[in-house]
Every structure is written in structure tokens, then in C-alpha cells.
Amino acid sequence: MRAVVLDADGLPELADLPEPSGAGLLVRVLACGLCGSDVEKLGHAARGTVLGHEIAGVLENGARVTVMHRVSCGTCERCLAGHQSTCGEFRELRIAPGGFAEQLRATHCVPLPDTLEELDGVWVEPLACVLRAAASVPRGRVLVVGAGAIGQLWIQVLRRRGDDVVALDPRPERLATAHLLGAETADVDTVAVAVLTAPGGINAALRRLEPGGTLLVFAAPEEDVPTTLDAVYRKELHVVGSRSATPAYFREAVELLPTLVLPEVTTLPLDRFLEGVELYRRGEALKVVFTP
């Protein structure tokens, strides 16, 4: 089968791999979304790695599914405290290989309803992550930093729970979409919560947070952005990190997904993987999805 495999330098190349064997159900991949975390791993991950975890697929019996690529134990001290993504078992991948392949094996599959379009399963994992993270921050006036694909999911989730949402993004076309989804796009002085959905923007968030406010880090901040913790100290801010999701949030995402306005997708075949990565890096594609 074909797959996008990282070479000795951590760079992607299209290669032929044996059909996956071992534990789990055999899944034929219909589509796999490109996540920012995938792009971050390029040039760094080990040789032979196949990335991709935002997956829409179909089982041998014809059932459509998405998959959970990491699962916590659910019983350890960290899991019981609500920090499932820091569980020791969470580090183990539950799919082999990754989603940028024609097939994979997965130990944890989540059924998808027929009401979803065939490729919409790629949105379940990111939406589940948004739902879990949103549950960890208080309600109020929320600044969403970044109105890209993930930011647009955030806006809709927050508006549905009754929050006033302000969107911040340098691209006018993305702000226009954010406005249509119910967010304010005029700049504001203070907010109760700031959600960082893309690298960069942390200083803009810290400036706008009111005393006692909450900063939710939902994307890895850029390493070269100079940031001071002075605002955290002086305004007594709360800083929360959140990544990944639990089975309960996957199920909730499956139910919620058909009611959302999904971001625009650029669909490419696997043999145009590098092109898709560059479109993502330049901000020319809101969401890149690859099909085998």
C-alpha cells in the first residue's frame, strides 16, 4: 500500500509499505486531515514514521469510522484528576501506521453516522479536542486568537454555550467568516478568557486578559516569540494547557458535528503531500485534507 513515510532526515516521501498487520481492526483510510502538530514533526520525527491522526475511514464490513490514535487508561491518578493526556498509556500510539496511508490498524474506532459526509470524519478528532478544552475554562467574554479552521470550531462551540466571543486574526477573510459565525471582530480592551488556537499571539492575549482571567494554550507557542510572565504575575492570571480528547468527547463531537458550519477544505492526493504542507504553512489553505 502507499503511504507518506518520513526519511532519515524526517522529511516526507511517498513509499510502498506492507499491508498493516497486528492488533486492531483494519481500516481503509478515506481521508486524513493535516494537523499543525504533523507539520511541527516534519524534519524531527524518526525515520519510517507515518504521521496523520485526523482520520475518516471504513472497516472491512463497510462501517464508517474515525479512530482514536491515543487513549489513556482512565484509572490512574492523572486520569482521575482530568489530565488524561499526561497518562503513561496515552503515550502509546493506538494506530499503525498513521493516517497518511491507504490502510491502518486501529484498536479504538468510533462509529460515524450516515448523516455525515464521507470525508467529514476528519473533523471529529479536532472537534473533540476543542470540546474537552472548552470544558476547562470559565464562561464569559472569550478572545479566540486565530480564526483559522480550529478557531472557527472554537467560535461555534463557545457561542453554543452562551459565551460572547471576540476573534483576532491578521487575515480579513478569516475575520469575515468569524463574524458570520457569531464572533465580534472589533478589537477589545479586556476579556475574561483568551484561547490561543495557533502559534503566535500569546502577547496579544496576555495584554487583553482582565485581572484573574484565564489563558488557554491550545496550540504550541512559537519558540522564538519573546514573552514575559509579568502579566501573569501582576494580573494573577490562570494559565491552562489542553491537548487531545477522551472517548466521551469523541462521542460528543460525532453528535455535534452535523450541526456545525465546517471550515473550507482543500483536498489533495497523497502524492501532493508537500504541496499541501506548503499551502498550510503559507496560510493559503484553511484546512488541508489528503485522500489516498
State where each predicted segment sits.
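N-terminal glycine-rich cofactor-binding segment
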Residues: 3-20, 33-58, 81-97
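Glycine-rich beta-strand-centered segment in the early N-terminal region that forms part
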Residues: 20-32, 42-80, 110-115
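NAD(P)H dinucleotide-binding glycine-rich loop of Rossmann-like/cofactor-binding domains
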Residues: 71-145
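Mid-domain Rossmann-like dinucleotide-binding core that forms the NAD(H)/NADP(H) cofactor-binding site
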Residues: 116-187
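Residues in the short beta-alpha loop(s) of Rossmann-like NAD(P)-binding domains
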Residues: 171, 221, 245
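Glycine-rich cofactor phosphate-binding loops and adjacent beta1-alpha1 units
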Residues: 176-236
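Rossmann-fold dehydrogenase core element
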Residues: 214, 226-263
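C-terminal hydrophobic helical "lid"/dimerization subdomain
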Residues: 247-292
